Amino acid sequence: MKFIYALILCLAALAVPAFAQEKPADTNMQILLDKVKADKKLVVAANMDLTEPEGKTFWPIYDEYQKELQSINDRLVKMILAYADVYNKNALTDAGAKQLTNEALAIDRDELRLRNIYTARIERFLPAKKVARYLQIENKIRAAIRYELATGIPLVP
């Protein structure tokens, strides 16, 4: 469980400084992202109790899912940075707010679509209880990260 908290703090640290500085240190951010990905996989592994045959089928699917999820995460970071830019300049227009809202909703839709696709794939190889457990782990991690991000991102003025 300590891994989850460390993971959350690391991810939250990535987005929130955007409201305080002009340019993030890309190298440091990439190192942090790589560490977070590795720690997340450790959290999942420690909590799934997979047999060897289950692991052989689960982990390749997990890795594919995380790779596709990364593109959604990249969009989320891009959206947060765009908001940070206009927020810091006090330049958010109604049109800009609508664009941010539409992108946020599209990100949520795409994440749900991806989760449904990969849940169906995992269900072919794991018992339903383990599928549910994995979804709980994934959802708790993502919810905690979103919460931490939300606490650091100011409301639209």
Residue ranges of each PLM-predicted region?
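N-terminal hydrophobic signal/anchor transmembrane helix of membrane proteins
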Residues: 2, 78-80, 137-142
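Sec/Tat signal peptide C-region and signal peptidase I cleavage site
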Residues: 16-20
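Positively charged n-region of N-terminal signal peptides that target proteins for export
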Residues: 1-4, 21
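Charged, compositionally biased N-terminal leader segments and the immediate start
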Residues: 21-27
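Amphipathic, charged alpha-helical segments and their helix-to-coil junctions
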Residues: 28-31, 35, 112-157
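Active-site-adjacent substrate/metal-binding segments within catalytic domains
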Residues: 38
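Bacterial N-terminal signal peptides
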Residues: 5-15
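Amphipathic alpha-helical segments
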Residues: 29-30, 43-125
